[in-house]
Amino acid sequence: QPHGYGPTRFLRKDFVEEISAALRENDEIWMSEIFYAGGTAVKDISANDLIEDIKAKGKKAYFVEDRNDFLNEVKSSLSNNSVLLLMGARDPSLEEFCKELYEKL
């Protein structure tokens, strides 16, 4: 979950380059929409823009508009030896979301 529209816009190229370089052949990245903490942000970028850029580099990248749909979307990609790493910034609900996801797995 990217953090903030301004930082995502500013760091877009770096995010795409670094994430693409880190992903191995069978790795996947799933991303939900940018976390909006309020204020007067210009919402002219989406996490889907990052996903499309990463896909263009030949990587397995997926956008989930509503993170509550994430588990249903990702289930078919998970196996017994999968590693699922959830990351986000400044979203106070992320911890609870992770706990709920773990319980459902």
Feature-to-residue mapping (PLM):
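ATP-dependent carboxylate-amine ligase
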Residues: Q1-L105
